[in-house]
Amino acid sequence: MHEDDNKPVFVTVAGPRDYTDNEFVINILDGLLSNIVTKHNRRVHIIEGGASGVDAIAKQYALQRRVNFTEVKADWKQYGRSAGPRRNGKMAEMSDYCIVFYKGTKGSASMIVEALKKKVPVYVISVSTRVGVGKKIMISNLEDWEYIKECF
């Protein structure tokens, strides 16, 4: 966690590229980001990966709510298939928290793992109809994720 009281709380928002329920994502972000602001008494700064789906909704959210944000795009030309995990690692390094909308995709799983490797707490929100859309859990270590991911 950043110690400077003037610095914002950096929150990565990530999830599937094909998930487009704007209203659901916005409602979750309103609640979780409000809790983070209240807990730390600091503004938030959103980090998103520049992809379609949840990333695009997070960017739209930041613009509509006048929240500062950073877009960290994957360099697919330079890094090929490793570009996504590299980008996720970079976003995790920048973050105090991650909010990941999850339905079992590799990219979202990579974001969760990269954040947990760097000791960044992750809110995982199910967007899987199999598990139940909207179920939330906070994870703070890889061991818990290894167990919990089987439930998703």
Give the predicted meaning of each segment.
Residues H2-V11, D18-W145:
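Acidic/glycine-enriched connector segments
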